């Protein structure tokens, strides 16, 4: 009877193979509550996952590739679990990521300009070989 009921269930190794994730990652996702509605245990103690968990793992992987953290993904999955489509919240998260990337790019441009300025001065005034108080006087403002 148990085998008939479990035919639509995947062991963790099978799920890892099909999803492209490691067993360790899947266990971690289960531990932090990302897979809770889709996990059962067999009578012998094996984790058994509903085949729909593959869609859930694909969503997690894609959301991470777009820059969302697991902490940001978890509430989106909770909305889905309550029967809601989380697309508006996903859109909001992606817009926040775009803003954060823009701010980071500005900071990197500023850092790049500072590095170029230091290297320009470096060429004009090579460091002396004499030791002094500064570890490298060329990078001191």
Regions found by a protein language model. Give the residues of each.
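C-terminal regulatory/oligomerization modules of transcriptional regulators
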Residues: 1-6, 84-141
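Basic helix-turn-helix/winged-helix DNA-binding cores
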Residues: 1-78
